[in-house]
Structures are given as C-alpha cells and as structure tokens.
C-alpha cells in the first residue's frame, strides 16, 4: 500500500523531473520512461519509489498505460513551487481535470514525448525556463520550445489554432519550427488549421524575418513512407506551404538531429566534413544540391531528413534524366531508399562515429 507522502524528492533530480513532466502534461506514457536519462534498472527503481511513496499512480484503460499524479503529489508540488505549477494543477486546466477518452489521453502522451525529447536535447521547454510566448520576440534566449497551450494563451488570436495538431513551436537561431508528433499512429492532419498556425506566427511578430518550417516526430523511420504518400489530410507537408519539413524519430537519433537543427554552426561543421573531396554546390540549379561530385552530379546532404527537399531532389533528377547522391545517416538509409527512385544513390554516415567526433566533441 502506498505511503502518505510527506515530502517531494529534491529538485534537479530524475524523480522530480518525472513528477514535473507528469504535472505539465497530465499523464506520462509508460512507454516513454525508457527515454528519460538513466539506465533501465535505475528508471524502474525511480518509478517504483514514486508509486510506493504515494506520488504517482498508474492509470490503465483500453490498453493505454500512463502515470498520473496523486492528489498528495499535486498538493506538495503546489506548495513547493506555486509559480511553476499553479497554472497546471489548479482550476479547470486539462492536466488537473483529466479525462479517460483515448484521443485526449493520446494527445497528452504526444505532448509528454515532445517535452521529454526537448529536455534531453537541452532545449528550454518548461514555462519557467524561458520568457512567456507573448514576449518571445523580445527575448534573446534561443533555442526555446513553447507548447501549443502556451501559444494559445496569447489571447483571442489563439482560438484560430484550436484544431491544429501541432504540439508546439520551436524557436532557434535558424528559424521557427512548428512541431508535431505522430507517435506510432498515422496522424489525421488539419490542413487549414496548420496553415492558420503558420499565418499566426507570421502576423504576431515572433522572429518576424525567420523562416517557418516543420518538424514531425514519429516512433520509427518506417513511418516516413506513410507521411510522403499523397493523402488529402497530409497534403500540406509536401505542397510547398512549408518548404522544409523534417522527420525525426522519438529516440536518441531524433534527439541528435534536433540538436543540429538548433545549432547552425554545428550543421556547418558537419556540412564541411561531408563536402570534403566534393566541388562547391551550384545555387539555383535545375536540381537542388549542396555539392557536386567529380562527375558533375548533384549531391544532397539529407541527414536532417528534410523530406520535401528530398522529394524535390528525387523528382528533379528523374525529370532531367540525371543521377545524384543523397548523404544520410546509416539509420535513415533503408527508409530513404523506400521513398526515393532509381536516380538517387545513397551514401550513409556512421551515426555512432558522428556522435563521438562531432556532436559531443
């Protein structure tokens, strides 16, 4: 039987982090625990201890399992940091008034997954770690991630994006990224709502000169082929509304790409390594490219998995009867082979070597 909790774990510990993520989202997916920092045995012991101490409980229904705060945990968190948690653990806020319907719970799980990967990538994502969204244009602190809930708090304008499937937006030195999470399922996109979200960012003056792109997270690389199929609901992914849309997996691979998208200088470093032995790219050529090989064929650096750009490269090669090389990470190669035609040759980078020599060097 769980104890009656008397105190919280210390801040800046993994147990407190898990309680924080659960408080902000309402329900934390069991399957996501393995993505938190730490070994599997330690993570299991943390969850067991929080349950035993009466701070977390398991909620399971319709095959979907998650962790929820107990009433005692809410009380202790509010006493510990009211300025952090009052907006989430009081009144009629969704994390405080949880529902059991599968669509609502899945949305909470998707939000939790994105908050976790942002935290793992050292991107400020908790409300108290950054300026309010209404003041984001005056803040120099980037990168920063804002949940869709934070964006909607700007006032009446926020109602225009009510139907959007975006989990939030990521502000970086390279631009703004509307962020989505399809998880294991095929997402039903809301075309008009997503374009309204983009228009809202353009009119609200958040980084007014920044390019607006998209990131969609999924569970595996195999889901990429589904996203690139011509479908009425996902048409905006490839119709040019967003010239750049990146597919990232919800794991350490996706975390690494996320770090690259937030760090222009590190991308330049990797590009310079990949360009060694190649000729300089040709701007505004008939085939989009980052470099030219010794035979005069275009080369595209595709390690960020910008799938509209990859599709444009593939289509242009076929249209002009040319061949070209697409450079990606080894874990992306099989999925990219599936969506590219015979004109594209794939060349892969060893991801583990990249981690050791570039990402964390």
Locations of regions flagged by a protein language model:
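Short amphipathic alpha-helical interaction segments
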Residues: 36-53
């Amino acid at each position: 039987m769980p104890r009656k909790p008397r105190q919280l774990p210390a801040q800046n510990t993994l147990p407190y982090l898990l309680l924080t993520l659960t408080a902000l989202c309402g329900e934390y997916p069991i399957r996501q625990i393995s993505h938190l920092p730490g070994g599997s045995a330690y993570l299991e012991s943390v969850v067991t201890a929080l349950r035993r101490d009466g701070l977390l409980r398991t909620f399971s229904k319709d095959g979907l399992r998650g962790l929820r705060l107990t009433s005692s945990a809410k009380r202790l968190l509010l006493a510990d940091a009211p300025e952090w948690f009052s907006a989430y653990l009081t009144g009629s806020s969704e994390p405080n008034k949880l529902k059991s319907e599968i669509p609502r719970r899945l949305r909470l799980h998707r939000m939790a997954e994105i908050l976790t990967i942002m935290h793992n990538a050292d991107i400020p994502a908790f409300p108290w770690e950054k300026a309010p969204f209404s003041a984001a244009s005056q803040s120099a602190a980037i990168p920063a991630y804002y949940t869709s809930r934070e964006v909607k708090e700007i006032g009446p304008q926020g109602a225009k994006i009510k139907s959007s499937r975006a989990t939030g937006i990521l502000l970086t030195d390279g631009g703004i990224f509307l962020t989505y999470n399809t998880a294991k399922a095929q997402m039903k996109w809301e075309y008009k709502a997503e374009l309204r979200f983009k228009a809202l960012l353009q009119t609200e003056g958040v980084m007014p000169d920044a390019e607006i792109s998209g990131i969609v997270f999924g569970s595996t690389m195999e889901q990429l082929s589904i996203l690139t199929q011509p479908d009425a609901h996902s048409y905006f992914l490839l119709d040019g509304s967003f010239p750049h849309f990146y597919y990232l997996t919800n794991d350490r691979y996706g975390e690494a790409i996320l770090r690259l998208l937030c760090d222009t200088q590190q991308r330049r470093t990797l590009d310079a390594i990949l360009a060694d032995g190649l000729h300089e790219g040709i701007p505004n050529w008939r085939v989009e490219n980052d470099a030219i090989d010794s035979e005069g064929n275009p080369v595209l650096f595709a390690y960020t998995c910008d799938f509209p750009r990859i599709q444009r490269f593939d289509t242009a090669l076929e249209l002009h009867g040319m061949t070209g090389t697409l450079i990606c990470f080894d874990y992306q190669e099989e999925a990219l082979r599936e969506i590219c035609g015979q004109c594209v040759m794939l060349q892969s980078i060893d991801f583990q070597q990249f981690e050791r020599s570039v990402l964390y060097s």
